Amino acid sequence: MSLLNDIDQLSQVRTDWTRETAGEIYRAPFNDLIFAAQSVHRQCHPANQVQTSQLLSIKTGGCAEDCGYCNQSAHFDTGLKASKLMPLDDVLDAAKKAKDGGATRFCMGAAWRELKTRDEDVICDMISGVKSMGMETCVTLGMLTDSQANKLREAGLDYYNHNLDTAPEDYGRVISTRTYQDRIDTLSRVRGAGIHVCTGGIVGMGEDEAARIGLLTELASMDPHPESVPINHLVAVPNTPLGDSKPLDGIEFVRTIATARILMPRSMVRLSAGREGMSRELQALCFLAGANSIFVGEELLTTPNPEQNEDFDLFKSLGIEPMRLGETGTVPAE
């Protein structure tokens, strides 16, 4: 495929990707795709460096949304016990442990539809406290108003996560209580407040190839591109609508990572949920395809994650260095 042969061109950020072109990239011969993705990665990022972030559920369960993949939804009987918002000191203690363990970004997630006024101040205190430790800060709190986004930025928020989940045409199969446009509007408010955008999606939900390509095209059409792009593999939870979904073929997952790297060359592409079910070899292929960020810690919100020593053992065997505090993970554009 001629497009994959021009690495210098592929390494330039563009936001005019079409589904047709993205599909040609996704379906390219596997060796050509991986070679191109790794070449783009080396042009735009340190070749053997991966960012390590840690994610903490600061408010678990009882969510009013009906996301078909989520065990925190109040719509499904998954046996998860809902909890109130964690105390500030407990969150900061967890952040300190994350930093001591090598994490350079600390992410805080709350299971609710939107940030409520009564919780704004304590959330801002959490952000300020983590920021004072020298780590990057990230939260995922559902929908926001413009004033809330500005308040979070003033507290020191670096990144806001709000995933698109899937392609627009596949979205109604996954969730009915929030529209696709709601998600786009929230991301626009985040960007307008000067906060970096973290948005991606979930694969392995029974979607077809076209939906995966559609999701990636939506993300790569954002101007500017999201700074962080988490690619999650569904962790199927019993008693949720998507609990019987079959895992996505590993090669298809790697194709998704590689295509994300090519379409969004300067974004951090994160291996997120689902790594616990992946072999070391599959994860290594994902790093080869351009993934350069992971979550460390035993849990991602409420789903299992590889133990941190397993991750660093894998890094050692692959010659990968964890990103240090203050490093950006990108090579300056020429």
From Swiss-Prot:
It comes from the Bacteria. Keywords: 2Fe-2S, 4Fe-4S, Biotin biosynthesis, Iron, Iron-sulfur, Metal-binding, S-adenosyl-L-methionine, Transferase. Pfam families: BATS, Radical_SAM. This is Biotin synthase. [2Fe-2S] cluster binds at C107, C138, C198, R270. [4Fe-4S] cluster binds at C63, C67, C70. SMART domains: BATS, Elp3. It is an enzyme of class 2 (transferase). Pathway: Cofactor biosynthesis; biotin biosynthesis; biotin from 7,8-diaminononanoate: step 2/2. GO terms for molecular function: 2 iron, 2 sulfur cluster binding; 4 iron, 4 sulfur cluster binding; biotin synthase activity; iron ion binding. Binds 1 [4Fe-4S] cluster. The cluster is coordinated with 3 cysteines and an exchangeable S-adenosyl-L-methionine. Belongs to the radical SAM superfamily. Biotin synthase family.
